[in-house]
Every structure is written in structure tokens, then in C-alpha cells.
């Protein structure tokens, strides 16, 4: 059952404060609205209240059905295209040139732009960001020749660019947001029915699930929130896979950070996890390289794979692999966030890689691409491993994506080093070892060895995704150690309403530990509850 209610500004006699925003909130304000999905739970024995409870799974299935988009956009190039043309630097505009090149070479977005679908229905093409991007992509991919240079449209750049160095990731998020708003405006002009999605949401949008579990009664509450990009802490990670795994580790809420349990009626020790629930078609991974305090850059090497399996990091990692292929890498070359130079490497529709450095477009190979100090990584989901956007044979893709294969391969190599026998063909183990070393593999695709896949009764693969702009955190804020202020009832399933659009790109603490917001809605085992009722359960 889907419940849609509207709460007044004040409920339960309390004027509830607003929490800081997450950096993708503005984008999702009109996309999702405020929703809560749950069913009326019978009074359950505390011992039976767990993530594996059948009643809870029924509701989660409903949540998945409601949150999953039904977009029709292809994930691969409908017709192979060569690289786009170079872009003119109009004065400290390398950051926006790099971001625009990555968007231009995003397969599902480029195919939608080349279809001219938006401009055919747009009633206000003057000043429309979506029309401007459509014209930009069409000119770059279809009507240019080798060596051509374009000047980005002022419609795309003027609202953001002030002829000074800016953050490419911020411009990327700003551009996606304005394109989304343009799509919604077109729909409003032709149909008064509320529209809650757009091609931008369908391509880039995903959802993550937060879970808080009382360690005393085992009662569990779930919160769902949208994300547009996935920032990764790389301060101690050697690879993107390790950073994904590290951010999904369970966090204990103890002492002042303890969680108020609605069943125990007091603050109790709890565990908290945050991981991907609905995977996006296009995955943006942002490596947190810049200090929020000084702007200084963490210029360390972090490896990343050409092919990434996201399945181990899902909230429910079942079924086969969920493969993604790298198609763009945005790079910052410099010492601080307000200096240096931006460029990118992109994979064209015909499968070849190119370095896009303002006006210069040069051929490069995947080896050099994987050696860059990446800032933003762009992956597209692969539903068909034989698509042109993947250069590797299907069998090799399965090998690269399967962590179990990588572990077995490593063990075989160790055994061969200790063996001096020959096989039936007379080939010595030493020769076989040399031959094996020539095989291309993605070492960073391995699951970290220290990970216990079945620890404390929790499923493996939990990824903590904090959609937050790293350059706008409040000083001293620690996302993994925020004070618990929210009293979630047991077995609650909450879908957060996006916050105010006023602070795009501001800090994003873990929302399940923040006060309730006007408009958030919830249905629990005790029935429908308002934010005021939640806060009056004895936790204040």
C-alpha cells in the first residue's frame, strides 16, 4: 500500500528543525516528493524482529517496485559514434569542458539527445538547458570533423561559470539538475498531471537503504534515500573496490551516539549500515580528493577497474553479476581545488579511448586511462556483455567480474610456484606460470580478503553511500559519528522527502540520525504516525 499524506509545518506541538541537506537533494525534490511505504505489522516477538522477517521482505519488495524506474533508455550506443570535437577554453573553463565531454559520451544520454525527442516537444527552446545540451551533443558527435573545435553554449555555462576555476564535479551536478528541471517544465506545459521522473533521473538516479538495528531486541528500521553520485573516501583505500567495501562496513552506535529504540523505550547500542538498494544505470563514483578545510588535494594513487561488478555492494546481493563498464574518467591535475587543470578520457561509441583536453582530442589506450589519478569515474551498467561498448570477450568479462574466480586464480598461482612437475603435454609449471602472468586481470576487482561475508548474521556487500559534496562539509563533521537524534520505531520503512532546494551541494550527515522533517511520512506496526508522534515516544 502506498501512503501519501501532507503534514503541516508543526506537528505534535513541536516545530521540528531541518537537517543539513545531502548534495543530490535539490535534484530529487520534484522527482520523488515525500513517500513512505510500509504495511500494518502485527505485534511481533522481539526475537523475531530481524532483517529476514517475511513481513518486512514483503514490504521491501513493494518499495523496490515503487522506486525502480521504468525508463526506456538504452544502455549502449544505438549506432557507434566516433569521438566528439574539442571544446574552446573561454578562460578558466577547463573544468566545465571536461564535465561536458563526459556527459556527451555517456551512451544512454547521448542516444537520447541524438533522437531529438526533447526538442520536438519543448515549448520554450530559448534558454532551455535540455535543448542546449541536445544541440551540443548533436553538433559534437554528428556534425563535426576531425580537428573541429566548439564553443560551449552560454545557456549551459553562463549560470555557473564566472571566468574562474571551479570544481568540475559541482558543475556536473548543477548541469544534471538544470536539465532535469527543463524536462519537468516541458511536461507541465503539455500535461497538468504531476510528473515525478525525467530521462536524467532514469539514467543517473539510484537509491540507497539505511538500516539501524537495536543490538538488544534486534528490532530494525529502514530508511530509503535517493542518490545521484557516490562519493568515496580514499584516505586509506588502495583501490575503488576497497573504498566501496570500506564505506559499507557496519558502524556501532554507542554512548552519546546510542540509538533510541522504540521497542526498548530507551537509548540502546545499535548497528548502522548504509548500502545500495536500487542501482543506477549510470554510476558516478567521486573520489574525495580535496580537503574540506584547506582545499588541498589528496594526490595519491587509487586503482580502479575497467569492469566493475556492483553486486557485492548491494543491500541484497543475489543472482548473477551486476556488471558496469568504465566509459569516462575525469581528471584534475594540480595541488589544490582552486588551481590546476581539468581534462578527461572518454570511450567513444566505436569502443576506442580518447583524451579530451580542451581543444585537443588525442587517441589513447585503456592502460593509460587506468593509470590516471581519477577524480570522477563514470560507469555504465551492462545488461548485454556482447555490446560494442565492452571490448573484452564475454567469457573474460565473467572472469574479471567474478571475485571468486580471482581468488581461485591467485591460489593456483601460489600452488604452481611450489611445483616443478610437468603436465600431460610436457609443459613445466614454471612455463605455465609465465604464461599465466601474461593474462590481463583486474586485481582491484577482488573482494578484500579480510571481509567476512557472513558476519554477525548480516549479508555481505553492504555499501555506505553518502551523496554529499566533499568540498562543502562543515568543519569537524564526521559522517560516521553523528549524534543520534531520531527515534525511529521498530520495523519502520521510511522514504525521505528531498529537502529544500536552497542549499544544493551542502553537507549530508546520515539522515537516519537526524530529526524528522515536515513532510516525511511513515507507516509502522502501530499504524500511521506523524513526525510529532515519533518525537514524543519518550526519546526526548
Curated annotation (Swiss-Prot):
This is Ubiquitin carboxyl-terminal hydrolase 17-like protein E. Residues 1-22, 431-461, 499-540 are annotated as: Disordered. It is found in: Nucleus; Endoplasmic reticulum. The active site is at 94 (nucleophile), 341 (proton acceptor). One of its GO terms (biological process) is regulation of cell population proliferation. Residues 431-441, 508-520 have a biased composition (Basic and acidic residues). Its EC number is 3.4.19.12. It comes from Mus musculus (Mouse). One of its GO terms (cellular component) is endoplasmic reticulum membrane. The lineage of its organism: Eukaryota, Metazoa, Chordata, Craniata, Vertebrata.
Amino acid at each position: 500500500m502506498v501512503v501519501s499524506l501532507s503534514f503541516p509545518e508543526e506537528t505534535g506541538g513541536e516545530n521540528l528543525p531541518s537537517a543539513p541537506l545531502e548534495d543530490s537533494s535539490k535534484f530529487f525534490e520534484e522527482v520523488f516528493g515525500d513517500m513512505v511505504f510500509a504495511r500494518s505489522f502485527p505485534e511481533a516477538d522481539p526475537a523475531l524482529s530481524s532483517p529476514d522477517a517475511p513481513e518486512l521482505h514483503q514490504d521491501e519488495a513493494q518499495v523496490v517496485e515503487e522506486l525502480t524506474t521504468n525508463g526506456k533508455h538504452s544502455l549502449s550506443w544505438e549506432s557507434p559514434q566516433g569521438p566528439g570535437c574539442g571544446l574552446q577554453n573561454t578562460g578558466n573553463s577547463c573544468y566545465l569542458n571536461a564535465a561536458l565531454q563526459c556527459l556527451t559520451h555517456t551512451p544512454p544520454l547521448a542516444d537520447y539527445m541524438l533522437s531529438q525527442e526533447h526538442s520536438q516537444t519543448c515549448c520554450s527552446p530559448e534558454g532551455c538547458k535540455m535543448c542546449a545540451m541536445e544541440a551540443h551533443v548533436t553538433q559534437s558527435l554528428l556534425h563535426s570533423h576531425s580537428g573541429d573545435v566548439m564553443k560551449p553554449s552560454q545557456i549551459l555555462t553562463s549560470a555557473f561559470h564566472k571566468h574562474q576555476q571551479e570544481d568540475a564535479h559541482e558543475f556536473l551536478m548543477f548541469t544534471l539538475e538544470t536539465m532535469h528541471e527543463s524536462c519537468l517544465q516541458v511536461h507541465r506545459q503539455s500535461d497538468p498531471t504531476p510528473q515525478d521522473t525525467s530521462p536524467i533521473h532514469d539514467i543517473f538516479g539510484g537509491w540507497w537503504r539505511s538500516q539501524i538495528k537495536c543490538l538488544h531486541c534486534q528490532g530494525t528500521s529502514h530508511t530509503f534515500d535517493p542518490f545521484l553520485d557516490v562519493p568515496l573516501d580514499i584516505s586509506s583505500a588502495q583501490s575503488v573496490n576497497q573504498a566501496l567495501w570500506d564505506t559499507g562496513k557496519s558502524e556501532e552506535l554507542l554512548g552519546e551516539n546510542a540509538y533510541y529504540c522504540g521497542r526498548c523505550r530507551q537509548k540502546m547500542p545499535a548497528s548502522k549500515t548504509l548500502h545500495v538498494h536500487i542501482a543506477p544505470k549510470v554510476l558516478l563514483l567521486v573520489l574525495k580528493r580535496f580537503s574540506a578545510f584547506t582545499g588541498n588535494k589528496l594526490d595519491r594513487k587509487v586503482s580502479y577497474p575497467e569492469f566493475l561488478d556492483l553486486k557485492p555492494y548491494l543491500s541484497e546481493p543475489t543472482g548473477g553479476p551486476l556488471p558496469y563498464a568504465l566509459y569516462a574518467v575525469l581528471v584534475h591535475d594540480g595541488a589544490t581545488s582552486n588551481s590546476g587543470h581539468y581534462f578527461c578520457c572518454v570511450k567513444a561509441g566505436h569502443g576506442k579511448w580518447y583524451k579530451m583536453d580542451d581543444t585537443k582530442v588525442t587517441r589513447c589506450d585503456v592502460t593509460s586511462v587506468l593509470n590516471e589519478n581519477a577524480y570522477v569515474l563514470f560507469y555504465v551498467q551492462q545488461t548485454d556483455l556482447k555490446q560494442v561498448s565492452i571490448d573484452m570477450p564475454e567469457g573474460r568479462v565473467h572472469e574479471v567480474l567474478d571475485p571468486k574466480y580471482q581468488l581461485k586464480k591467485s591460489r593456483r598461482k601460489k600452488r604452481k610456484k611450489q611445483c616443478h612437475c610437468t603436465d600431460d603435454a610436457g609443459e613445466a609449471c614454471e612455463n605455465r606460470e609465465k604464461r599465466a602472468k601474461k593474462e590481463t586481470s583486474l586485481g582491484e576487482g577482488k573482494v578484500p580478503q579480510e571481509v567476512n561475508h557472513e558476519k554477525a548474521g548480516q549479508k555481505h556487500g553492504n555499501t555506505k553511500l553518502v551523496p554529499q559534496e566533499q568540498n562543502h562539509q562543515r568543519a569537524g563533521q564526521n559522517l560516521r559519528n553523528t549524534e543520534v537524534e531520531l527515534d525511529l520505531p521498530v520495523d519502520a520503512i521510511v522514504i525521505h522527502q528531498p529537502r529544500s532546494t536552497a542549499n544544493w551541494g551542502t553537507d549530508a550527515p546520515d539522515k537516519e540520525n537526524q530529526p524528522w522533517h515536515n513532510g516525511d511520512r511513515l507507516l509502522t506496526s502501530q499504524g500511521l504516525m506523524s513526525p510529532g508522534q515519533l518525537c514524543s515516544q519518550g526519546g526526548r
